[in-house]
């Protein structure tokens, strides 16, 4: 159990000293990381996360989301509740849109974000990169709307400009 604790602490970006610390000494972000480490130490097949990046700085949020993505890529199931559509675009495969406690829609991420009018009707913001790509395409570019990464977008714009 101790070996597993060391392993998961490292995965969430904390050193072994956290095994001996009082929870009252930890910041909000550290408490969240310790809680996630405790869950991962149980080696669950399904991980349900409710706003998992709340209280984390941008770098810490990215690290946690990358960790959850690796967990999912290892064959495990990750269910994430999030209002951050930038995170949904980059880290999710499927989306369930809830409306007044009811399932409004279930679909793939690319399908959801291709329907600007529907999103506006539901007061859901487009991810920044998706919004930018749609604006470019309305202006005459032909950029793949399923791009999720800024480097890939830069290359696509360069290809359009040079092509």
Kindly give the residue locations of the regions a language model identified.
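A short, surface-exposed alpha-helical micro-motif characterized by mixed small hydrophobic
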Residues: 88-90
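Conserved catalytic motifs of ABC-family nucleotide-binding domains
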Residues: 43
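Conserved ABC ATPase "signature" region
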Residues: 2-17
């Amino acid at each position: 159990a101790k070996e597993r604790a060391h392993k998961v602490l490292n995965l969430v970006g904390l050193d072994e000293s956290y095994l001996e610390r009082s929870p009252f000494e930890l910041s909000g972000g550290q408490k969240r990381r310790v809680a996630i480490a405790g869950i991962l130490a149980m080696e669950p097949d399904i991980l349900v996360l409710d706003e998992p990046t709340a209280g984390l700085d941008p770098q810490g949020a990215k690290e946690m989301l990358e960790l959850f993505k690796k967990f999912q890529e290892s064959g495990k199931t990750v269910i994430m509740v999030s209002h951050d559509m930038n995170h949904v675009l980059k880290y999710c495969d499927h989306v369930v849109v809830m409306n007044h406690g009811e399932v409004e829609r279930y679909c793939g991420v690319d399908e959801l974000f291709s329907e600007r009018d529907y999103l506006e009707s539901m007061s859901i913001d487009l991810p920044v990169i998706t919004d930018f790509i749609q604006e470019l395409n309305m202006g005459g570019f032909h950029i793949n709307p399923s791009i999720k990464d800024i480097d890939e977008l830069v290359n696509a714009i360069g290809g359009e400009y040079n092509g």
